[in-house]
């Protein structure tokens, strides 16, 4: 267990007055969690301190070689003012997997969860009260050796920051248009596609901007070898309901193992659906659309939870899904997931972790 020292701010920030205008990641809370790593000493000096910049040398290796990882999760306020997390242990395990791939010392699962709970407890007044709004939590580690040699750092900083964030669907769930990217790729076997590291996201910006210029909300990524099998959409996993069955790419090294993805699969199986995790060719998806068998398409992720898709375009061909409306399975998943997260329905899966008042 971490011995977390807490230094509270003497200059608290003004909290947002209008929670309907929070946006995402624009305003940050009063405090942050910080812990240092030194080779030979390990992780040490766990602390919660006032939110502030890090003084870093221009030659700090993370600026040059991107040795860093991050996570994304949320804290929710229920109607009875309970603050709760959703499957934080899953984020902790994925954080370890990302660390291993980037040669970063791992944070023990229980320490990761304790650090998140402690910071959320200290910042519980920042968790929004508005329905659909939440406190976004961003844990991250970066290398902070100074020097230009290409090698694993001997020093790291683990930090967690929080940002109150508005409802993703402030005006209701509106299905989106997706562009199937067949030039740029997001990941390839042996690389870092299964991790949450900044390089993956930086490399996706170009294709995302080009798609946005054409009026599409997201990019659907194909595999990096043959460019024929679907993998992810934007920064989310994606699922296809075809002729009664649900298909999604397997997490075999090029696809991020999303916590929301995993949860949706478990729910779908509970409800009796066949869920096939494996290779699914974009050509087969388009053919299913032509035959009227492509019933629903939706992305899954922390930010949106479930994001319905109304249109795919690939090589100039358009596939229209569900008359442009959210499908019944997509809606049921969204209602069930958000219902548990905000405490509106019972947590029958044991996924919810209440944040106790300790700090």
Q: Each PLM stretch: what is its role?
A:
Residues 109-111, 119-132:
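Charged, gly/pro-rich active-site loop segments
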Residues 122, 142-144:
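Intrinsically disordered, low-complexity linker/loop segments enriched in Gly/Pro
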Residues 128-138, 142:
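Extended, Lys/Arg-enriched charged tracts that mediate electrostatic binding to polyanionic substrates
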């Amino acid at each position: 267990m971490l011995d977390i020292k807490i230094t509270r701010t003497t200059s608290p920030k003004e909290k947002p007055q209008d929670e309907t205008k929070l946006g995402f990641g624009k305003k940050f809370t009063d405090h942050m969690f910080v812990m240092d790593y030194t080779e030979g000493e390990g992780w040490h000096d766990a602390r919660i301190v006032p939110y502030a910049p890090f003084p870093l040398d221009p030659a700090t290796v993370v600026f040059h070689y991107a040795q860093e990882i991050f996570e994304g999760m949320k804290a929710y306020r229920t109607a009875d003012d309970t603050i709760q997390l959703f499957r934080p242990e899953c984020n902790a395990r994925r954080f370890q997997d990302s660390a291993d791939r980037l040669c970063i010392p791992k944070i023990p699962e229980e320490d990761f969860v304790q650090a998140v709970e402690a910071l959320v407890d200290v910042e519980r007044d920042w968790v929004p009260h508005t329905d659909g709004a939440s406190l976004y939590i961003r844990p991250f580690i970066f290398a902070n050796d100074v020097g230009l040699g290409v090698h694993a750092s001997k020093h790291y900083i683990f930090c967690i920051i929080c940002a109150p964030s508005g409802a993703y669907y402030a005006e209701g769930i509106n299905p989106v248009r997706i562009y199937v990217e067949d030039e740029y790729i997001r990941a390839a076997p042996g690389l870092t596609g299964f991790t949450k590291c900044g390089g993956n996201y930086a490399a996706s910006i170009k294709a995302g901007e080009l798609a946005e210029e054409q009026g599409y909300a997201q990019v659907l990524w194909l595999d990096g070898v043959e460019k024929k099998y679907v993998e992810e959409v934007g920064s989310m996993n994606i699922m296809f309901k075809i002729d009664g069955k649900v298909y999604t790419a397997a997490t075999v090294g090029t696809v991020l193992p999303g916590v929301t993805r995993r949860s949706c699969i478990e729910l779908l199986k509970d409800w009796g659906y066949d869920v096939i995790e494996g290779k699914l060719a974009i050509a087969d998806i388009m053919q299913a659309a032509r035959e009227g068998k492509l019933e629903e398409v939706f992305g899954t992720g922390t930010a949106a939870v479930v994001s319905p898709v109304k249109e795919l375009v690939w090589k100039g061909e358009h596939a229209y899904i569900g008359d442009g409306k959210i499908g019944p399975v997509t809606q049921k998943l969204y209602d069930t997931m958000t219902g548990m997260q905000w405490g509106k329905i019972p947590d029958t899966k044991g996924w919810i972790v209440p944040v106790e008042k300790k700090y």
